[in-house]
Each structure stands twice: as C-alpha cells, then as structure tokens.
Swiss-Prot record:
Function: Catalyzes the reductive methylation of 2'-deoxyuridine-5'-monophosphate (dUMP) to 2'-deoxythymidine-5'-monophosphate (dTMP) while utilizing 5,10-methylenetetrahydrofolate (mTHF) as the methyl donor and reductant in the reaction, yielding dihydrofolate (DHF) as a by-product. This enzymatic reaction provides an intracellular de novo source of dTMP, an essential precursor for DNA biosynthesis.
Top-rank EC class of the record's enzyme: transferase
Lineage: Bacteria, Bacillati, Bacillota, Bacilli, Lactobacillales
Keywords tagged on the record: Cytoplasm, Methyltransferase, Nucleotide biosynthesis, Transferase
A single MF term (Gene Ontology): thymidylate synthase activity
Positions bound to (6R)-5,10-methylene-5,6,7,8-tetrahydrofolate: 223, 317
EC number: 2.1.1.45
Annotated positions binding dUMP: 25, 180-181, 220-223, 231, 261-263
Keyword flag Methyltransferase: yes
Stated name of the protein: Thymidylate synthase
InterPro entries the record matches: Thymidate_synth/dCMP_Mease (IPR045097), Thymidate_synth/dCMP_Mease_dom (IPR023451), Thymidate_synth/dCMP_Mease_sf (IPR036926), Thymidylate_synthase (IPR000398), Thymidylate_synthase_AS (IPR020940)
Localization, UniProt: Cytoplasm
Disulfide bond positions: none
Length: 318
C-alpha cells in the first residue's frame, strides 16, 4: 500500500464513520468533521492519489496561475483548465448583460435535470469560448476578484501599496530559516465579499529543519472528494518548487482542515474509491535548469511513474 496516500483515505473513513450531517451554502448537504490533520512525508513519494485518476496538468496550471498573481480564468482556459469556470460563469449569468436561458441555481438543476444540463453545458461552453476570444469580455467577466493570485502576490495595504507574500516568504526562508513568521495568507476580510469564492485554503506556513522545508496549510473549507486531492498535490508541488529555489530538501506537507466535508451526492463515489487498492506513489520531476519559482512553465513540471485507477466523476457544488 502507498504510505503517502493513506492519510487521505483515513480521512474519508473517519468522515463516513464519525461525520455530522449538515446543511451548506450550496443546498446539497454534507457529512462533516471539524479540525482534522493529515501529514505527508514528501521524501516518500509525491502525494498524487492513485485510487482515482487526478489530472496533474490541471494542478500545475492552476498553481502557476496563482504564482503569476493572475485572477482571470483566461489563462486557465488557454491551458484547457476548467476548474474555476462555474464561478466566473455564475457572475456572467447573474449580470444585466446576460440574456440567455434562465440559469438560476444552475449547479443543482444540472444534477437533477438532464435536459437542463445540456442547455447549461452549451451556455457555459459558449461563455468559455468568448473569454478566450474576446479580451474585453474576459476582462469584465473572466475575473474572479481578489482570489489567491491577488492575495499571494499583490496584497493591498491600507496606504495603497502592495505586498508580494511569495517573494517575501522565499527571502525569509533563505535569510532567516528559523523564523516563525514564514506565512502566506489569502484571507483578507475586506475582500471576502468581493471574491467569487472566498479562499478555502486560507493560510500556509513554512518550517525549516535539518536542511528540509516543510509546509503546513490551514484550509477553512475542504471538499474532501473533489477539492482536497488537488490541494494536497498543489501544496506539495509548491513546497518542492520553493525548496528548489532555497536550496533545501523537502520535508513534510501538513494539511490541517477546518470543516472537512463530503457532499451527500458524493457518498457513492467515495465508497467506490475506498474499495480500490492504492498503487505506489509517483515521483515529481522539476526541470533542473530552473531555480527560480517564477521561471517555471508547464513543461518544466512532470510526474513520473503515475499509475492510477480510473477517474471517478462527481458534480461540483457551486
């Protein structure tokens, strides 16, 4: 069994066994636990799940999008990444400029009505095409507000200046590795009402010991089946990339969850996943010629020996 994957599978088991049923913003309903922690030793393998196929290309393009300080889905769409489509699409169909079919509560309706789902998928496809082809439209409706990229790279101060938290934390790791202030936060209370989706992975901290870089993430809200596998791999990748720039080896990724939940319409999927036997964890390859985290492109990041079971589809709660 892959040691790297086991903490995640145990999280699923614990929620199924001990979770509390709760209502939620999306109207779907969840089983939930509060205050849960997983630890992944990054030296033992890269924590990309093997009990279902996780598309690593989406993970690395999203992380590069964050690191660019970008908040517009156009970059993602140009890399065939549709993770954030629904939130930008929601802004579009709720605007005065939208005159197409009624898209009220499109997330739930698409799950319950096959005919509506076809209309919804068609409208969303047209929206995404227009984002890519029309810069003015993309500027207006492709922007998600002050989400991760903005907060990481362009945190707005009260005097009108900006803070590049990623640059600052890398400099601190290099020059003062024993600091307890190596923190990046995406949670800005002033900006929360203005974001398409307030940051779920809210704050992360680095720790250096014995030449190894570890990272701990606090995630306020954790969609365990769909979101958490991406979050684990994304922050593991970020830790590897920053370790490369700072001349360190990788240590642990510690994942602390606030509200860790499985949506009620994902229960069949998680039970199917638990029936599968994990394979050995893959390894991460970073282009050895790239030293600066901002210089990485898609082709500079790969996973090797990734052998997974098939994907398991599930609806996104919006």
């Amino acid at each position: 069994m892959s040691i790297v994957e086991e903490p995640y599978l145990q999280l699923i088991r614990d929620i199924l066994e001990k979770g509390h049923e709760k209502s939620d913003r999306t109207g779907t309903g969840t089983k939930s636990l509060f205050g849960y922690q997983m630890r992944f030793n990054l030296a033992e393998g890269f924590p990309l799940l093997t009990t279902k196929k996780v598309p690593f290309g989406l993970i690395k393009s999203e992380l590069l999008w964050f690191l660019r300080g970008d908040t517009n889905i156009r970059f993602l769409l140009e890399h065939n990444n549709h993770i954030w489509d629904e939130w930008a699409f929601k802004n579009w169909v709720e605007s005065d400029e939208y005159h197409g079919p009624d898209m009220t509560n499109f997330g739930l309706r698409a799950q319950e009505d096959d005919n509506f789902n076809k209309v919804y998928q068609d409208e969303k496809k047209k929206f995404c095409q227009k984002i890519v082809e029309d810069q003015e439209f993309a500027n207006k409706f492709g922007n998600l507000g002050d989400v991760y990229g903005a907060q990481w790279r362009h945190w707005q101060t009260r005097n009108g200046e900006t803070i590049d938290q990623i640059k600052d934390v890398i400099e601190t790791i290099k020059n003062n590795p024993d600091s307890r202030r190596m923190i990046v936060t995406a949670w800005n209370p002033e900006d929360v009402p203005l974001s398409a989706l307030p940051p779920c992975h809210t704050l992360f901290q680095f720790y250096v010991n014995d030449g190894k870089l570890s990272c701990q993430l606090y995630q306020r809200s954790a969609d365990v089946f769909l979101g958490v596998p991406f979050n684990i791999a994304s922050y593991a990748l970020l830790t590897h990339m920053i370790a490369r720039e700072t001349g360190l080896e990788v240590g642990e990724f510690v994942h602390t969850l606030g509200d860790a939940h499985i949506y009620l319409n994902h229960l069949d999927q998680v039970n199917e996943q638990l029936q599968r036997k994990p394979n050995d964890a893959p390894t991460l390859w970073l282009n050895p010629e790239k030293k600066n985290i901002m210089d990485f492109e898609m082709e500079d990041i790969k996973v090797k020996n990734y052998h997974s079971h098939s994907a398991i589809k599930a609806p996104v709660a919006v």
